[in-house]
Amino acid sequence: MSASVRGNSKNPQSTSAITTLTDKLLEDISGDFETLQKQFSEKLETMSTRLDQLEESMREAMNKKSSVSPVTSTE
């Protein structure tokens, strides 16, 4: 492995630049992860709300169906 790849103390500017770049990349990845986490949570909350609404409408439909009396013939 060459000295520049190992990042030895002969070139501290190179080591500092790599450290700075690595820190920046980690910050970017962390920020992206937080954004994705927020988006996922928002989508999950939206789906939960929609499922609650669907359950309620199904419950109402079942109640209406059970409250309608069957039509009987008088023949």
From Swiss-Prot:
A Pfam cross-reference name: HSBP1
GO biological process, one term: cellular heat acclimation
GO cellular component terms, semicolon-separated: cytosol; nucleus
Organism domain of life: Eukaryota
TM stretches of this protein: none
GO terms of molecular function: transcription corepressor activity
Family label: Belongs to the HSBP1 family.
Protein name: Uncharacterized protein C16E9.15
Organism: Schizosaccharomyces pombe (strain 972 / ATCC 24843)
